[in-house]
Amino acid sequence: MSCDRGSFVASRASGLRRAIVTASGILALALSASLWPNSAAKAQETQIIYPGSMAVTGFPGTVTPDFDSSDSGKGGLPPGSDPVDETFIDTSQASLRIFNVSRLGGPASGQLVYTPPPFEVTAGQVGEVFGLTYDDGVRDGVPSGIPNLYAAATSLHGIEIVTPDADDDGRPERQRRGTAGAVFMDGQFGTENGGGPGTIWKIDGISGAVSKFADIDTNSGPGIGNLAFDPTHREFFASDLDTGLIHRIDVDGNLIDTFDHGVAGRPAHGLAPVADDGAVMDIQAAAFDSEDPDTWGYTQDARRVWAVAYHGGRLYYSVGEKAEIWSIGIASDGSFAGDPRWELTVKAGQDYAVTDIAFDNKGFMYLAQRGPAENRYDYGRFADSGKGEVIRYQHEDPDDPATESVWVEVPQEYAIGFPQGNRQSAGGVDLQYRYDAEGNLDTSVCTDTVVNTGDKLRDNPELAERLAAGGPLAVHGVQLTPSALVKPANVPPFGSWFVDFDGYFEDPDVQGHVGDVRVWRPCEGRAGYYEEIPGGYLPPFYPPDFLPPGNLPPCLDVADVQYFCTPRGLQADLYLHDHAGLGGDSIKAQSKTPGVAVTSPMSHAPGKPYTIDITGHNPGETVNVGLCFYRKSDQDKGGYYPCCKMTLPLRTPDVSCEGRDR
């Protein structure tokens, strides 16, 4: 299923523009102009995802019949009709885009960034999607260095239903209320390609091909809150807004099992269990109202899981509108460990759902709020936005025994958008590499930039003159901000860059049209996979991902190991002895023990030990760590480079660094 189309300019454009001035006063949301001409997205032969690639979901826009046509059977508007009744999701436009944001064009000054044409996946292919995640790029057991992207069906961009054509105009009939014969509108859930409200779609990172990966077929319409990938056990997690269950899914798309927070999680914090009430979305029942999310079959708020994120051997997740953050351990076999733990209750200006969670490599947890779901019949508003925050928490250091949580009580907040209050979050957040002083991506620093989705990001009448120098004001998309710039810094956010989702700037009043954001950010180097030993390498130097013979003398030894507990988990400081005289100054580390995750920073201070983080292990367990010792200057040249490899058995201390129970 390729996405084969040209620019946003279409033959319907004149009619769409005219809709703005009709007596009904509706806002025409169909795209009539594009920032990216000829931005066709077809199946590729190379790759569509690179380090730093930024995937964003959002509403694709609408299409309305040509008002100038006198023949309604050829697309015209029947006399006396309300244009809104004849306005549909534009299945030819994108609900998912993958942006190249490697060069932002200059220092941050609050400006709009003009990116190369993004890769696009249309609503006709996948319908409306929100949650995103990447896998690890392993293909047929071989690491390729190019991941696949996954996108989940959503109701957060509205629920639209239709019945068969009744007035012989060649189009179905829009319905506000449930009625016999109603079905989901084309472009809602990708039903034309076998999709539904519980579908997770896979976008191949090399070819761009789109396929159905998994289906939670019990989901009646609320859709999926978000997705997470566990690289240690190579499995996925998806939060089900219909039942409140967290589904565990294998790499082939098979549903394995579930975790029920309402029943099994809440009692761990002294709360009464809450079972699913069994409510479903029935679009053929009179009680269904497309403009009232309370009729959509969402599970109760107390058990409604929105965001999911795997970190440090645990799955973190958010619950409810007055958001709480919880976590549950993932056992060595990948199963739910049965140890749910309340982490914190979010402190923010509004009791809004946290629809996305991200972690950096410094121990911070980032949360993005999204305003309550809405669904205006004219497609103008899908969320009550303008008060949603992006905040971050860190572990108490040292831990304060007088507080209930191991996290600090008051989070740090980012200034999101230019409107008054700077709280324009649309519910997506992730981390990006660092950008240098000229706005160029620096992949040597892993989590130095916060990226988040938002509405009306550059709209502020009081600052209009200054903002105009940086591009259009009606920007609904992504804000990129150096992670150090928490409030009161960067207020207003002239220290940020902005990217528009659809390249259309004549829609200042829409809300909730942007969804999630996810960055492909490999942080442990990208050695790649080599099928044969390249020339020029003598023992004991081998390409980083090539397994050397087992009869070579050791090229590296460990003189000492010291362990510390940090907010990230167990830290091991390695003092290395360079037997081979390589002169290395960097390491890459990976776990060779199933169920255990090992990470290493991409930089090393001269004279200091080499540091690795270990998570997912049992106290006292011996963890086999694969080390690659190399010179960064060799790596920076590109291509193959010498690497001294060894497997190091580390016996971990008989203590847990996962934090104390409350």
Annotate each predicted stretch with a short phrase.
Residues 562-569:
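Short, solvent-exposed loop/linker segments at the N-terminal edge
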Residues 576-582:
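Extracellular acidic, Ser/Thr/Pro-rich low-complexity tracts
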Residues 21-34:
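Bacterial N-terminal signal peptides
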